[in-house]
Amino acid sequence: MAPNETVFRRDLPLAGVYGCVQTHGLVPLLIRLVTRSPFDHVFISTGGGQIIEAEPGGVRIRDIAEYAGCRIEYNTGEPMTDIQRAAVAEYASSKRGEPYAWAADAVDGLRCLGLRWRILARFERARRSVMCSELAAQAGQYAGLDWNCGQDDPCQVTPAMLARRPGMQPGT
């Protein structure tokens, strides 16, 4: 098996675990280049092979098998209680249908390039949409976990930041 190849089992990952994934395409490649990370997307497992994620089109539930062949790392090495895992999955599921935050992706890109204007923070807080890493950070907050990666607000968290947290392990 190649080092970046992921084997999928329907019983993994556990509910409440987030996964950082390296997807295919031009936009994901640009995200990885700007954030200097091998990962460009984040999802949350709801168990039974199902995940919830913020993507173009909004927050939706999908099957983990859609990422077969993609490199994935999960935060399975992070200590969490069953109650915290359930809370993460519950929160993420409650956001189903919420719009995707295209503008937030642009703001994150500007930040990664070194632009940190105050107006960017005001813009982020005023929106009513969510991006993938923000959804994970918010779900962590809801469960009493600090997944903000040192940022003041979940809307400032990127997939790269979540992937660099302790406890990340290759998907199995």
Question: Can you annotate each of these PLM segments?
Answer:
Residues A2-D40, G47, I52-P56, R60, ...:
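N-terminal capping segments
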